[in-house]
Amino acid sequence: GIDLGLKDLATLSTGEKIAHPRHYRRLEDSLGRAQRANKHRLARTIAARIGNSRRDFLHKASARIALAHDTIFVGDVASSSLARTRMAKSVLDAGWSMLRTQLSYKALRHGGMMVEVNERFTTQVCSSCGALPKVRPEGIADLGMREWTCCECGTVHVRDFDRVRSHVARE
């Protein structure tokens, strides 16, 4: 299973985290200067460099994941709705939909399959016992809560890994 995120691009059920290179954020200042100075050719070159590096990174990451796993579970994150929030630049810089597209065709090419899983309550439901405890991370306000303990079974959960385990358990 794979959990797509903003801090790390992806967290795998194996415990591996794929770092988020932040292609746009790295070149954002130089792109802005070129746009303000009306240097259209330079701005176009910088924008192409951002897109090419993001595409290259996602191709390499998706190929590595597709080769290593037969079945891939990915959450159905609605990046278009998150792109209208204050996290828009980070969401669009991550390239989640491009990664999902590449994972789906590369998994098929290598004899596997990719399944999109409903993400609803995956960070809130205990992946061990299935309980929905009263003390749990809820919504955008609790994004800072990275660990929580289930009141029912006492299991300590790290938010990203628990979400991945919930993806696999749902299917």
Identify the residue ranges that each predicted region occupies:
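Positively charged, helix-rich recognition surfaces that bind polyanionic ligands
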Residues: 1-171
